[in-house]
């Protein structure tokens, strides 16, 4: 359970079935994150391996995901898309409107022609490795209804008290553990949002959710691996590493390494989503000072005019920043100093966040700017520039509207088994071309490490 390498092979893909998610009360920010995680094969494998675990109810978020995916992949019937020349399940272009209300589901059965329809019709118990040709009777079946993500009501309330889904008749069998967003260990910057603004931010919710699942896995692992009385080993927990150590780099240059945060323990979540950033601080007459810290989400500034692509944003992020007016603490004189970022280690799933929102007084302003991004991305670490790790895009989350508190989220998810992109807009979804995805004003990008 602790090591993701012990789980089934990556080649054993969980077949993805498209299902819409009902917007219960301005919860489109949650829906796009749930759809994105559903499109993540590594995450699906983790949750799938929890299905036979006893007392899963002790871990509220894991239990909610297990219930959610049981419903999501249940009743393997035909998942038919309307094919009025554009293969869509909705009759309106709601994905481009700035509204937080759910789009009505006006699906009508038509003859399916897309590969994903044949795949959905061939599934058994929600799992399949190869698509098959659908029969005529299967083609005439109605699409599955959208799911009400009621399992996450308590979680949404704990994330933001201003977002309160409509009460459900089903009572949760457990109480949600309250987790303050201020205590998240993996936030690399403080948004400091005014309290009067409704903080319905998909990026914040994703980091909040991953941290919550990570903490529950720590408890689960500790419960499973209870040490014996004579076992003197340290139990699984968040442990403090040495504050500083000195390393010798290229050409004999030395540097002081500092861990700015607590070491992130090994769980399936940290193994999938967590990387490590390296901050290098250089000043005249001193050794290089390096700070390393874990991250779930890479926050990239896109405000400068020269930034028009993901590659531009990454270069700007890693560009050395000259620190003006830096004074030596011992000599009390001004010296040259600079700071730069690089990757110490890269995650299996890379989450990129384009910083589109700025907050002034009690209002949020959005930067509407098209940032190009590739379907294939290559990155390297600070210690190994020669070896490029290759990533493949599988999720694009877009925000529509001028402000964070009044906008709407949609997402595009890639289904590798059918080589098809699907656009989700709450309870509706539609097949889209890759170029349509690349033309989106993306807010979040999710890339998966290849091989």
Swiss-Prot record:
User: Which residues constitute the catalytic centre?
Assistant: 399, 408
Region annotated Disordered, chain positions: 83-154
Q: Which residues form the USP domain?
A: 19-450
Stated family: Belongs to the peptidase C19 family.
Q: Does the keyword Protease apply?
A: yes
Protein's gene: ubpB
- Residue stretches of biased makeup (Polar residues): 116-135
Please explain the role this protein plays, according to its UniProt record: Required for proper prespore cell patterning. Plays a role in stabilizing mkkA by preventing it from being targeted for degradation. ubcB and ubpB differentially control ubiquitination/deubiquitination and degradation of mkkA in a cell-type-specific and temporally regulated manner.
Protein's name in the database: Ubiquitin hydrolase B
Q: Which GO terms describe its molecular function?
A: cysteine-type deubiquitinase activity
Mark out the compositionally biased spans (Low complexity). Answer: 83-115
The EC number(s) given in the record are 3.4.19.12
GO BP terms, alphabetized: protein deubiquitination; proteolysis
CDD domains linked to this entry: Peptidase_C19
- Which UniProt keywords are given for this protein, alphabetically ordered? Hydrolase, Protease, Thiol protease, Ubl conjugation pathway
Report the gene knockout effect.
Null cells differentiate into prestalk cells preferentially. They develop precociously and exhibit abnormal cell-type patterning with an increase in the prestalk domain and reduction in the prespore domain in the slug, and spore domain in a fruiting body. Null cells do not form the normal spherical sori seen in mature wild-type fruiting bodies. Instead, the sori remain elongated, similar to those seen in wild-type fruiting bodies that are not fully mature. The upper and lower cups of the fruiting body, which are derived from prestalk cells and anterior-like cells, are enlarged.
Q: Which reaction does it catalyse?
A: Thiol-dependent hydrolysis of ester, thioester, amide, peptide and isopeptide bonds formed by the C-terminal Gly of ubiquitin (a 76-residue protein attached to proteins as an intracellular targeting signal)
Q: How does it assemble?
A: Interacts with mkkA (via F-box/WD40 domains).
């Amino acid at each position: 359970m602790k090591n993701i390498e012990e789980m089934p092979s990556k080649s054993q893909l969980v077949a993805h079935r498209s299902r819409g998610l009902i917007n219960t009360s301005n919860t489109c920010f949650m829906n796009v994150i749930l759809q994105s995680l559903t499109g993540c094969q590594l995450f699906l494998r983790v949750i799938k391996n929890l299905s036979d675990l006893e007392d899963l109810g002790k871990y509220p978020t894991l239990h909610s995901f297990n219930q959610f995916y049981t419903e999501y992949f249940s009743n393997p019937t035909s998942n038919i898309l309307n094919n009025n020349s554009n293969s869509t399940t909705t009759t309106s272009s709601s994905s481009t409107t700035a509204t937080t209300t759910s789009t009505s589901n006006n699906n009508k059965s038509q003859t399916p022609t897309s590969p994903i329809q044949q795949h959905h019709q061939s599934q058994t118990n929600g799992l399949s490795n190869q698509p098959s040709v659908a029969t005529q009777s299967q083609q005439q079946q109605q699409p599955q209804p959208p799911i009400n993500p009621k399992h996450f009501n308590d979680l949404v309330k704990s994330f933001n008290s201003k977002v309160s889904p409509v009460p459900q008749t089903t009572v949760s069998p457990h109480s949600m553990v309250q987790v303050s967003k201020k205590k998240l260990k993996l936030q690399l910057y403080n948004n400091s949002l005014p309290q009067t603004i409704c903080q319905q931010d998909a990026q914040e919710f994703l980091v909040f959710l991953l941290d919550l699942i990570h903490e529950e896995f720590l408890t689960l692992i500790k419960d499973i691996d209870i040490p014996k009385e004579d076992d003197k080993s340290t139990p699984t927990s968040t442990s403090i590493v040495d504050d500083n150590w000195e390393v010798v780099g290229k050409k004999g240059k030395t540097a002081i390494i500092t861990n700015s945060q607590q070491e992130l323990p090994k769980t399936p979540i940290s193994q999938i989503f967590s990387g490590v950033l390296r901050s290098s601080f250089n000043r005249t007459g001193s050794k290089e000072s390096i700070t390393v810290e874990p991250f779930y989400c890479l926050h990239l500034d896109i405000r400068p005019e020269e930034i028009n692509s993901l590659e531009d944003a990454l270069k700007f992020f890693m560009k050395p920043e000259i620190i003006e007016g830096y004074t030596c603490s011992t000599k009390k004189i001004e010296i040259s100093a600079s700071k730069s970022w690089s990757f110490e280690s890269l995650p299996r799933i890379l989450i990129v966040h384009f910083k589109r929102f700025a907050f002034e007084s009690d209002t949020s302003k959005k930067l509407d700017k098209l940032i190009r991004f590739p379907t294939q991305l290559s990155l390297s670490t600070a210690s190994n520039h020669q070896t490029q790790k290759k990533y493949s895009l599988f999720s694009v989350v877009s925000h529509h509207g001028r402000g964070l508190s009044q906008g709407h989220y949609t997402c595009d998810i890639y289904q590798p088994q059918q080589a098809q992109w699907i656009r989700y807009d709450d309870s509706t979804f539609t097949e889209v071309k890759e170029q349509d995805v690349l033309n989106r004003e993306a807010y979040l990008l999710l890339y998966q490490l290849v091989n």
